[in-house]
């Protein structure tokens, strides 16, 4: 699809020792006659896990959440666990999120400019219908996306916005 506004977007990926940082910069390159425009975004981070049924996400306890499957709002209580299809949008926590899947740990941080965290796993039934995943692919993947969904950003000509997500491998316990 064509987006009828003047803009520049730059995605930077930085690999470090045990870390990965993804940064997105969006710039309204229009002139004053073009005016402002709004946008939302998400850094779609697909993570490999050993077994999603044993995976847990910590750090979202107490965060407001919207369950996209049930169209229900509430607050997260305890760690996030995965027992089937999962699609929720959280208010991003002030601190880092921790993913544990048995053997491996991952610390997930994001900039305050990305005010949401999307957590998604297709579960077995949906995964079987997806062309880009094997039928049992849901068992070894999890999306933890730094996002900006609830409050779109408005950029006037000349303004820019940036957001980032960083993944850091945690030492074995």
Locate predicted features.
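Conserved SET/PR-domain catalytic core that frames the SAM/AdoMet-binding pocket
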Residues: 17-19, 27-30, 159
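Hydrophobic residues embedded in beta-strands of well-ordered beta-sheets
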Residues: 20-22, 97
């Amino acid at each position: 699809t064509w987006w009828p506004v003047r803009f520049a977007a730059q995605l930077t990926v930085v690999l470090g020792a045990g870390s990965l940082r993804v940064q997105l910069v969006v710039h309204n390159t229009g002139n004053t006659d073009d005016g402002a425009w709004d946008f939302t975004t998400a850094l779609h981070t697909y993570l490999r896990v050993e077994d999603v049924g044993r995976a847990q996400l910590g750090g979202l306890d107490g965060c407001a959440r919207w369950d996209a499957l049930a169209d229900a709002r509430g607050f997260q209580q305890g760690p996030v666990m995965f027992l089937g299809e999962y699609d929720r949008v959280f208010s991003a926590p002030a601190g880092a999120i921790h993913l544990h899947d048995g053997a491996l740990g991952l610390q997930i941080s994001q900039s305050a400019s990305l005010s949401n965290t999307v957590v998604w796993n297709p579960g077995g039934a949906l995964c079987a219908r997806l062309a880009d995943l094997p039928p049992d692919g849901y068992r070894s993947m999890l999306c933890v996306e730094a996002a900006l969904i609830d409050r779109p950003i408005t950029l006037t000509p000349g303004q820019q916005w940036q957001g980032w997500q960083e993944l850091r491998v945690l030492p074995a316990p």
